[in-house]
Amino acid sequence: MIRKAFVMQVNPDAHEEYQRRHNPIWPELEAVLKDHGAHHYAIYLDKERHLLFATVEIESEARWEAVASTEVCQRWWKYMREVMPSNPDNSPLSAELKEVFYLA
């Protein structure tokens, strides 16, 4: 498995709405993530800085990257753009983080 971590932002007035929209996520989005080899996906909120820290284990970079082109992911991004800063294609602004320590 490949471990990934990334950081995103949530609008200051949208913390509760962001969480509501993820509990639960759409069943079809969950299915796409699993079908594309995502496991142990978690998102954490830093309320003071309005940051989202996400971790996920993936089976392959290619399969993970393919999620973005699915119809359900495109709909999800459009749905979420109201609560978080987004790119012109509606994908959330995000930065991948480099792993500097891991304890198995």
From Swiss-Prot:
User: Which spans of this chain does the record mark as coiled coil?
Assistant: none
Q: Where is the active site?
A: 22 (proton donor)
Catalytic activity line of the entry: alpha-L-rhamnose = beta-L-rhamnose
Sorted alphabetically, which keywords does the UniProt record give? Carbohydrate metabolism, Cytoplasm, Isomerase, Rhamnose metabolism
Q: Which GO terms describe its cellular component?
A: cytoplasm
Ion transport keyword on record: no
Q: What EC identifiers does the entry list? A: 5.1.3.32
In its keyword annotation, does this UniProt entry include Calcium?
Answer: no
Gene Ontology terms describing biological process: rhamnose catabolic process
Q: Where in the cell is it found?
A: Cytoplasm
Write out the residues that bind substrate.
Answer: 18, 41, 76-77
Its pathway is: Carbohydrate metabolism; L-rhamnose metabolism
Give the GO molecular function terms: L-rhamnose mutarotase activity
Database matches in Pfam families: rhaM
**Family matches, as InterPro entries:** Dimeric_a/b-barrel (IPR011008), L-rhamnose_mutarotase (IPR013448), Rham/fucose_mutarotase (IPR008000)
Q: What is its main location?
A: cytoplasm
Outline the subunit composition.
Homodimer.
What family is this protein classified in?
Answer: Belongs to the rhamnose mutarotase family.
User: What biological function has been recorded for the protein in this entry?
Assistant: Involved in the anomeric conversion of L-rhamnose.
What is the protein name for this chain?
L-rhamnose mutarotase
Source organism per UniProt: Klebsiella pneumoniae (strain 342)
